[in-house]
Amino acid sequence: MPGSEGAAASIWMRQERSAVGRPAQWSRAEITTVALGVADTEGLDAVSMRRVAAELGTGAASLYRYVETRDDLLDLMTDATSAEYEPAPATGDWLADLIVLGEQVRAIFRHHRWLAGLALARPVIGPNGTALIEHFLTLLQAHPADVGAKMEAFAMLNGITAAFALQEQADPALQARNFAYLGHALTSGTHPRLTALLTGQAQLPPPEELADRYADIIARVLTGLLGPA
């Protein structure tokens, strides 16, 4: 598979190593686990090479022997979350199977509140992510859609679910300000269609109402992309 000229190789295509002549004190998996703990407790901004090294009881310079950059660390963290899926066998109802998978995606995004934004801004494919794609395609094995449509469906399932997760995390005060501005803007009379849509609405639908529509929205998107089986 061709790569971008000059781009650094994926961390999983680089040999796991420690300092030359020294036994490995930690594994990438151990370092990743510590980084996940920091992110889950304090947020992604708290994750730095220095902070993770401190949690391990060493200096940042020592950590660079195992993980070259913070971006590598973020990639390891993202892929590690894909190991949390519990793949269920195909039932013969591809759409129901994908909705079940989507609900697992939601649960993982809720557990790791930093993950949805990172998944959208910095998508990464590692060993666990590759296994997840294989499972997704297995659920669609009997579906006649071509592989391009199936990969688009995989991307949309993840992207829409990430957007739902971010919406659930949104500040209610910001939503209230947005609705207040809409009410102000509609008094101009220049948005008749929006006015008709929102007439009688006391407030914008709360995030939990949108969350309740998750399965229906995902079903419509996936059916639109893939078509009937």
What do the PLM-derived regions correspond to, one by one?
Residues 132-183, 225-229:
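Hydrophobic alpha-helical bundle segments that form small-molecule/ligand-binding pockets
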Residues 30-37, 41, 72-87, 100-104, ...:
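Alpha-helical structural segments
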Residues 30, 34, 38-71, 76:
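Helix-turn-helix
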Residues 86-128, 157:
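Hydrophobic alpha-helical connector segments
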Residues 76, 80, 156-159, 163, ...:
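Short, residue-level hotspots on alpha-helical faces of the histone-fold
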Residues 2-3, 176-229:
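A structured, mid-to-C-terminal "fold-capping" secondary-structure block
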Residues 1-26, 192-204:
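N-terminal intrinsically disordered/low-complexity leader segments
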